[in-house]
Amino acid sequence: MSRFRIQSHGRLQEWVAEEKNYFTEVGLEYEFLVKPIVTWSAGVERVDSSPADIQRGAFESIEDGRGCSLSAACHWTVNMAASAGHGKMWGNVYSVSPSAIFVAPDSPLQSTEDLAGVPITVGYHSGSHYSTLQGLEKFLPRDQIKLHFGGLLLDRLALLVDGQVPAASLFGAPFYVAEQLGCKKLLDTTFMIGHLVSETASRDELEKYFTALRRAQHDIDLEPEAYKHYFLRELPERYHSQIDVRRFGPGERIVFEPYPREVFERTRRWIESWGLFPPEQKGSAGYEIAVV
């Protein structure tokens, strides 16, 4: 049997569980894959222009296969990916990630309503895409919400910091970077994250994995200050001298509660109401098939 493949997900829990040997202690045979920082903006000190829409994101990377036993992504994408047969959604756990729409420190935009007609840079078929729509539809008519698909999370941070876009949706470590660099938060868009499991992962392995993460989550809840340094591993070096990770929050929090049928079905209806997926990407599997 192949080893359970664990990937860093831009959050603290996997790093803490690895540091404390929790995966080993629960008897999980695994390998830890450190996801490299690979973005179109990586390795540059400044971004000088904004790209055209990049219509590729979390869902598309799942379609292609991520090479790990379990993938974390926003619950909208995991919901649709599981329905389309790209894995199964683990129904016993979800996460909640702080997220927000930011503008530059000197932006003339002051209120959420000022975002009407303003292109907000998000990641296509990713948490920022859906959470921006969900958050703004409480303030603006749908036809006044405008999006720009600017690539991955770190790409969006670079575009905002370097003044190439008027607004961007950020979460994880980039959320705290934007705060420390003086960017203004116009709307909180905190969202749920789901977990997609591959066909090669057994229930026993998954239960061991989440047992280890539960212990890590308890450690983070008790003393997040001991682990915030791991955020530097998730950020390009250009930001390291500009920030103090000790001032960061803890980021994503894993909630060890079920992701129920009602939420699954309500999420699907909302996605359909926006027409966010073309027919060739839509799945038809219901909760009883898509969720384990």
Can you name each region flagged by the protein language model?
Residues M1-L133, K138, L186:
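Short, glycine-/small- and polar/acidic-enriched structural segments
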Residues F59, T112, H129, L157, ...:
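Extracytoplasmic/secreted envelope proteins and their assembly/folding machinery
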Residues A72-A84, L133, V161-C183, R269-W270:
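A ligand-binding cleft/hinge motif common to bilobed small-molecule-binding domains
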Residues P105-E113, P141-R142, T200-E207:
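Short helix-loop capping/hinge motifs at secondary-structure junctions, enriched
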Residues L147-H148, L152-E234:
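Pocket-lining segment of extracytoplasmic ligand-binding domains
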Residues D204-P278:
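Secondary-structure end/capping motifs
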Residues E272-V292:
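Conserved C-terminal helix/tail region of periplasmic/extracytoplasmic solute-binding proteins
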